[in-house]
Structures are given as structure tokens and as C-alpha cells.
Amino acid sequence: MTNSNRIKLTWISFLSYALTGALVIVTGMVMGNIADYFHLPVSSMSNTFTFLNAGILISIFLNAWLMEIVPLKTQLRFGFILMVLAVAGLMFSHSLALFSAAMFVLGLVSGITMSIGTFLITQLYEGRQRGSRLLFTDSFFSMAGMIFPMVAAFLLARSIEWYWVYACIGLVYLAIFILTFGCEFPALGKHAQHSQAPVVKEKWGIGVLFLAVAALCYILGQLGFISWVPEYAKGLGMSLNDAGALVSDFWMSYMFGMWAFSFILRFFDLQRILTVLAGMAAVLMYLFITGTQAHMPWFILTLGFFSSAIYTSIITLGSQQTKVASPKLVNFILTCGTIGTMLTFVVTGPIVAHSGPQAALLTANGLYAVVFVMCFALGFVSRHRQHSAPATH
């Protein structure tokens, strides 16, 4: 593979995470405007965004098999057509049913693209380099989470309709579409060149189960926490701007943490540093929930920084549980993480209704504690040391 081809594929991976980050994180910014557009209360409008999460979940789950049937380049190009149709549907329809369908299609497209992006990184890089590259790739999720809410705020403040925010997000996919030209993708399944040697199917091992549970609990805990921080802060008497600043601080430090750890992780055993980071994140979240208002910004900044490497490290460790990185295994862990996204409001909504936002934050804290336990237990069964040692760069 030529160096220019590798660079193009790496950039496709970066942008695939940016696309999903933009779609997921911008929701909170536009939800009120969309509710007004359809003359609905915000509470019932939030339920329609479940279609976006459902699309992401289904596509990541199915793409473990779809990758071996449909070439990756074909999937990305077809995804561009679907993206254009979905954005057009948002622009020209006043039907809530069509809005929900468009959101589902956007979820499908971003889920397929993100699973391809993750797989490309696991194919292009090995050993500890794979972990640092995946982490840098995941930082584009947070970067989009910082940039697109600002874009949304800029457009909405000028009374420009909310659907232009999604048109701007579509430009990310346009860049992916352009990069597919003159670019060779790894072939899988029936499209791959098969050697004479029979392919030995590797067993995943119990470590994959620990990682899958950790992925689900981490994403559910993270989104459950960050979704209710503004309400919790407002309940303490903070202004809407100050409450929003806490969320921005979290994602900003999360992004800087990813950049820092993409360098730091190369020097440590991944399972050990993951266990330390999971433990620190659980403690920092508890300090944020129980601390004073004056200390909350500092706790959320450090929480964002030290938790930034957790999810990507879980995926990297999963890919290292077999000698050859398995797209099915990587997609299985991604699917578990996406189930966490789907369950966010299903789990935290009733808790908030019954006991208030602080109870939801404490639940998220408990989920982070489960992540720590899973990562600690993984140390006794993980195969990453025997598989990554020869491949370390």
C-alpha cells in the first residue's frame, strides 16, 4: 500500500468520527428549534432523536457482515447519496414521520461510516501504534462536538433555519466522498485475495465480554452524566451560560486529552493504564457530584481529560484479543457502546423524573465504577500482550 493511499484512508477514518460526533452532539443545540418547527413540546421531540441512535446501532451491528459482502468504497459512495436524500428530506418536509425517517437514515449512514473508519485504523496500524491512532481518530468526534454546536449557535442566532446545520454536517461526508476517488480500500470476505493456507478461526475469549460490558457501561455512564449536567447545575442556581460552559469544558478537555494520550499510550501497557484511567474517572466524577460550585469546573475539566482515552482503549484492546484484527469483534464492541447511547434516556429519564438530576449523575458514577472493575478483571485474562508484542513499532 502506498503512503498517499494510507493517508487518504486515515483521513476517511478521521472524518467518519467527525460526522458521527457532529450528528450526535449537535442534537441538544437544535432540539428546541425543531420542536418549535413542528409545534411540539421539547420532551416529546427528544424521543424522535432515538431514530438517529437506532440507525447508528443497527448499521454498526449489520456492518460486521455487510463489510464482507459490499466493498467499503461502494458503501461510502452509496452513503453519500443517502446523506443527500436525508438532508433534502429535512429541508423540504414538514412531516414528523419523514423527519424521523431522515434521522434514521442519517444514523444508518454515520454508523456505517464510523464502523468502516474504525476497521480501517485497525487494519492500517498494529500494536501500540494502533491504540494511539484510534485515539487520535476518536478526537475528531470531540472536535466536531465543539465545532458544530458553535456553527449551530451562529446560524440559529441569525434566524437561519435549523436544517442548514445538517447541511453543514453534510459537508463532512462530501469530503469523505471526494477522498474515495483514487483510493484503494482493503478487500474483505469474497472480495479478498485468498491464500492457499486455510484461515484459522480464533476464539475471542472472555476478555472480549469484559470489554463489551465496559464499552456499554462507559458510553451509558458518559452520556447519562453529560446529558444531565446542565439541569443539575441549573438546580444549584447556576445560569444557563455557566451550565453550558461546564459541558463545553468537558468536551474541550476531552479533545486535548485524546491528543495527549495518543502520544502517552505508546509508552504504557494498555490494560494497566486503562484500569488507572477508569478508576481516576470514577473518583473525579464523584468529586464533581459532591463538590462545591467553585470546584465543579476544575473537576469536570480533569474528568474530561482523564476519561478521554477510555473508550478508544477498550476498542483497541478488543482488536488485540485475536492475532488478526477481526471486523466482527471490533463491531461487536462498537455495537455494545452504541447500545449504551440508545439506553441513555431510557435509563436516566425515569431516574430524573423520580429522584432528580443528581440521582442520574450518581447512576452514571456507578457505571464508571463497573468500567473500572471490568478493566481490572481483564488484566487476568487479556491476550493483548502476546498478540501485540511482536507487532509493536
From Swiss-Prot:
GO terms for cellular component: plasma membrane. It is found in: Cell inner membrane. Pfam families: MFS_1. Keywords: Cell inner membrane, Cell membrane, Membrane, Transmembrane, Transmembrane helix. It is a multi-pass membrane protein. One of its GO terms (molecular function) is transmembrane transporter activity. Its main location: membrane. Coiled coil: none annotated. It comes from the Bacteria. The chain crosses the membrane at residues 11-31, 51-71, 78-98, 101-121, 134-154, 162-182, 206-226, 245-265, 273-293, 298-318, 332-352, 361-381. Belongs to the major facilitator superfamily. TsgA family. This is Protein TsgA. It comes from Salmonella heidelberg (strain SL476). The gene is tsgA.
